[in-house]
Amino acid sequence: MKQGSLSYNESAGQPWSSPYRWVMLAMLWLLYAFFGLAFRSISPLITPILADLDMSYSQMGLVLGSWQLTYIGASTVAGFFIDKWGIRRSLFLGTLIIALSVGLRYFANGFDTFLPLVALFGIGGPMISIGCPKTIALWFQGKDRGTAVGIYTTGQFFGGALALIATNRAIMPLTSYSWRLTFAFYGILTLLVACLWWVLAKDLRSSVLSEQTQMKGILTTLLKVPNIRMVLVCGLLTFAIIHGLTSWLPRILEEQAFAPTLAGYASSIPLLAGIPSLLILPRFIASERRGLALGVLAMLSASSVWLILFLTGFLMFVGLILYGIAACTLVPLLTLILMETPEVGARHMGTAGGLFFCVSEIGGFLGPLLVGMLVDWTGGFLAGGSFVVALSLGILLMSFFVKK
């Protein structure tokens, strides 16, 4: 460990027995909360951005999926660098890049400048979404690991819900309804969180847990494992579902006669509904039942999308709640399956996590883009919603291939 880097001395005991692991978990939660706030912050601002920058739905769909595209490239090497640099420096750098991506959107003057600023998020994002499970794998074991995965994952949904609720209700009025100043405000907050992480986070001082094999050899070995291949396919479909629907959800609700503020409130329902399930399900679903749970959640996700698109009133809100419970739990469930695959473990979780998010974000990119294109072609969101339902049924099919 380089001089000046904070580290946990393993001679004092195993990290999973140290009380400081809960401080690390709290900091991971905070980073993931601002990760969620950053990428959800565009959705409630789609209407003023479309008007101000004179963009089409297809262009906005490309913008919404652009950071996933850069994420794909960055995540191929992010896991390797996290293992090399340590989690403290890696996650600080990732959060700093996210802060720049959000804050610099203030200067966008059209599609050509807005697109790369949003895409920049995908450079920093992998450090967070890959670094968090890597940290959990190092600092937690047993049932505590499932609990920790559930807890830190709620951060993203809390941050996303905060963006959807507060943007039009509180932040836009404070900034004289300037979407530019709103992004600048969120960027400054994210920068402050990055500095807090730098002060409090600790690296593990360990040569045993670091990657000792060449990256190419590790990837080849991992891809030969059937469970890992299944997780990769399900991850791709899951991210297409989550980003494809939730990125457009405020606009979908606005087209159903919701006011922008009310659409933001309603769009936060899936995120808030997902928080209890994230705290409960990852801990209590036994490893041998995760395949069954994956299939059930996929069916619930498909059903909920139909309720959201085709019904109104109470049943539509039931659909929003059901979607949050089902879709929000898919990623931590897949993460646990990956993390506890014997060929992965804590040793290779950085590389395996990079591979998972690299493949998954292909779906994260294509989901919003294809939904936006279907809106331009058909004039409504029903075709895009049917596409999301089909993806959920694909996960149901793949769940039969999860090995106990």
Predicted regions and their residues:
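Conserved MFS/SLC helix-loop-helix module at the cytosolic interface between two early adjacent transmembrane helices
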Residues: 73-110
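Helix-loop-helix hairpin linking two adjacent transmembrane segments in secondary transporters
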Residues: 151-201
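Cytoplasmic helix-loop-helix junction between adjacent transmembrane helices
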Residues: 117-155
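Residue-level signature of mid-helix packing/kink "hotspots" within the transmembrane helices
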Residues: 40, 68-76, 161, 271-279, ...
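Extracytoplasmic gate region of multi-pass secondary transporters
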Residues: 42-44, 227-278
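C-terminal transmembrane helical hairpin of 12-TM major facilitator-type secondary transporters
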Residues: 289-337
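Juxtamembrane intracellular "pre-TM" segments in multi-pass secondary transporters
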Residues: 8-18, 202-231
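A late C-terminal transmembrane helix in Major Facilitator Superfamily
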Residues: 344-380
